[in-house]
């Protein structure tokens, strides 16, 4: 989509990063800026891994969004607050209660450790470890708070957030670039996730991140539509990473954005959220949210193909 692509290019500017925009009701990639980085083997997901961990804990019935989790002798926190403020201790506690096998099982269910795209040339895999990292490095707790030991790609994160945005369908992402390919586009379902009842438990925290939490910098540039998202900030071997994954919840449909930054300062999650706000602003100013092609309503019917890789 030329409107989305130009909006992303203008917002990213000279930052070393990539932007992936996805139509969550089909898995169609609307724009992919800096394809080399977008299709690379990925990076530590930082705090965006908390989305997967939260869904795992909700699926296992360990928590609801209001369940207080003890983080000390006198301090308790619920999921909504923990997501909004990206509280590491909360997700470390969840990870240890779940254990590595369940954490890994759900991460794979949501698409980590496997190709997110369908016949996208040059796409690399990312990596999810076969066992927990050593306790001296933080064990499963650090895997669940910072994504320590995990390598996630922007496409994998885009596919997972698209499944959250659409109610539980994990699509293969596809990137049609020719007009005839766009006209003949057919969504391909990877699998159905049993998360529809859990999404309301998750969405308050994702909305809170933008309204008052770690992603509130987005609202410096855009406040016309509801945005739900999750930031991530960390560093690995001297390289800083900044992530922000989100979706716009509009009256005519939804669109997913993943912003990934890599390098030195100011590379961190709130900066990625600020850039996402500029992208949404640019799209809004070009009437994308009024009648944008490629933004079908949630009730639209699309033909899909179930595909086995």
What does each model-found stretch correspond to?
Residues 2-3, 7, 16-31, 41, ...:
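Beta-lactam-recognizing serine transpeptidase/beta-lactamase-like catalytic domain environment
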Residues 7, 11, 56, 205, ...:
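Generic non-transmembrane alpha-helical segments
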Residues 35-39:
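A short acidic/small-residue loop/turn micro-motif
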Residues 46-55:
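Active/ligand-binding-proximal structured segments within catalytic/core domains
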Residues 55-59, 118-121, 128-131, 281-283, ...:
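Low-complexity, flexible helical/coil segments
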Residues 273-309:
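Short, gly/Ser/Thr-rich active-site loops of penicillin-recognizing serine hydrolases
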